[in-house]
Swiss-Prot record:
Name by which UniProt lists this protein: tRNA (guanine-N(7)-)-methyltransferase
Family: Belongs to the class I-like SAM-binding methyltransferase superfamily. TrmB family.
InterPro entries, per the entry: SAM-dependent_MTases_sf, tRNA_(Gua-N-7)_MeTrfase_Trmb, tRNA_methyltr_TrmB_bact
Record pathway: tRNA modification; N(7)-methylguanine-tRNA biosynthesis
Any one GO MF annotation of this record: tRNA (guanine(46)-N7)-methyltransferase activity
Organism the protein comes from: Neisseria meningitidis serogroup C / serotype 2a (strain ATCC 700532 / DSM 15464 / FAM18)
Gene name for this UniProt entry: trmB
Its job: Catalyzes the formation of N(7)-methylguanine at position 46 (m7G46) in tRNA.
EC numbers: 2.1.1.33
Keyword Protein transport: no
A GO CC term attached to the entry: tRNA methyltransferase complex
Length: 238
């Protein structure tokens, strides 16, 4: 796919999926030949097409292992590493960025990973229309765009209405794991999650980084800039 074709695909996607305020932008980035080849050859095995009807995740994965939703995986490096570290857990990874989708599929193939399925779609629509209540054992959202300008804060993904959409999909005892390198956003995340009676913080405030989460490029970048990194892990109690 050429840059022009990729950009046209993104423009078509935006036209077909209008929403007043989005937490992401469709970056017009170059799709490498290897990334496009991965999409062309591996999507049928590891990709899931969006449908506006409830999905059977066990059927999609061919297993009844625990299911983790990962929203916004970037280039997929951390996602592939987490899946490698947790082979008895299935990961549904969602992003709208074409090169990232292609790269994650490439990593799945190179690392012989059977426990990842990939979607290229708006996560909000997937949550609303495809995921059944009580179908998830965990949710990972690592380094979402902080939209640091105050006038853009309304675009931040982690807000109460979004968490309210997620909670019914999470099993009792399931968890939400967030991470950010933006301190003010970390405070907002803590405030939002703490506002739900059905969620219990696993730490006094911010959690130690779990062993399964590798350092991402965003985390490394933040550390180089002198930023801290904050993990939050909350469990659903009921």
């Amino acid at each position: 796919m050429t840059d022009t074709a990729e950009n046209q695909t993104q423009n078509n996607w935006q036209a077909e999926h209008p929403r007043s305020i989005r937490s992401f932008v469709l970056r017009q980035s170059h799709m490498t030949a290897a990334q496009q080849r991965a999409i062309d050859t591996l999507w049928d095995s590891f990709g899931i097409d969006y449908q506006a009807t409830p999905a059977d995740l066990d059927a999609n994965f061919g297993s009844n292992r625990p299911k983790i939703l990962e929203i916004g995986f970037g280039m997929g490096t951390a996602t592939a590493e987490i899946a490698r570290r947790l082979p008895e857990t299935d990961f549904l990874a969602i992003d709208v960025h074409g090169p990232g989708v292609g790269n994650l599929l490439k990593l799945i193939n190179e690392n012989h990973l059977e426990n990842i399925r990939v979607m290229r779609h708006d996560a909000v629509e997937v949550i609303e229309n495809m995921l059944q209540d009580g179908s998830l054992d965990g949710i990972h959202i690592f380094f979402p765009d902080p939209w640091h300008k105050k006038r853009h804060h309304k675009r931040r993904l982690i807000q109460a209405p979004f968490i309210a959409k997620l909670l019914p999909k999470l099993k009792t005892g399931g968890y939400i794991h967030l991470a950010t390198d933006w301190e003010e956003y970390a405070r907002q995340m803590l405030e939002v999650l703490s506002s739900f009676d059905s969620l219990q913080n696993t730490a006094a405030d911010y959690a130690p980084t779990p062993d399964y989460r590798p350092e991402t490029k965003f985390e490394a970048r933040g550390k180089r800039l002198g930023h801290g990194v904050w993990d939050l892990v909350f469990k659903r109690m009921g």
